[in-house]
Swiss-Prot record:
It is found in: Cytoplasm. Zn(2+) 1 binds at H89, H123, E150, E153. Expressed in interstitial cell lineages. Disulfide bonds: none annotated. GO terms for molecular function: metal ion binding. The keyword Transport does not apply. Component of the cytosolic iron-sulfur protein assembly (CIA) complex, a multiprotein complex that mediates the incorporation of iron-sulfur cluster into extramitochondrial Fe/S proteins. As a CIA complex component and in collaboration with CIAO1 specifically matures ACO1 and stabilizes IREB2. May play a role in chromosome segregation through establishment of sister chromatid cohesion. May induce apoptosis in collaboration with APAF1. Monomer and homodimer. Component of the CIA complex. Interacts with CIAO1. Interacts with IREB2. Interacts with APAF1. One of its GO terms (cellular component) is nucleoplasm. One of its GO terms (biological process) is chromosome segregation. Zn(2+) 2 binds at H89, H123, E150, E153. Its main location: cytoplasm. It comes from Mus musculus (Mouse). The gene is Ciao2a. This is Cytosolic iron-sulfur assembly component 2A.
Amino acid sequence: MERVSGLLSWTLSRVLWLSGFSEHGAAWQPRIMEEKALEVYDLIRTIRDPEKPNTLEELEVVTESCVEVQEINEDDYLVIIKFTPTVPHCSLATLIGLCLRVKLQRCLPFKHKLEIYISEGTHSTEEDINKQINDKERVAAAMENPNLREIVEQCVLEPD
């Protein structure tokens, strides 16, 4: 009977560990995702606003809570950013999204898939903008425009 109880206990602990509910799995997985989310936030918080002399962090366009990282598999992560424009009719929301994408594509040290959205209910044309900033062809076309590329470069430039 003791042997059966031990086997049952071992089996249950393995199932819980593999599903992420054990002492080690439960603490380990969220901690890694939190660290990666902070790493992402540290990269985007210093992006400058296209029309104001402030960073996106200072304007609360991005906050720590707007970054989510999920594990896709062992070496790949899904990074989701939900930013909040300063006003619901912000004409530069698409440009801000482009700056976020460019900075993260260049600087993230781990393999990732990137999804960038305007926080729900914070912009009058959020659906259209969300489509634009998550469309690879539109992003590539935007970065071919020398004037737009120069603005993006100025916004993502690291402060001294």
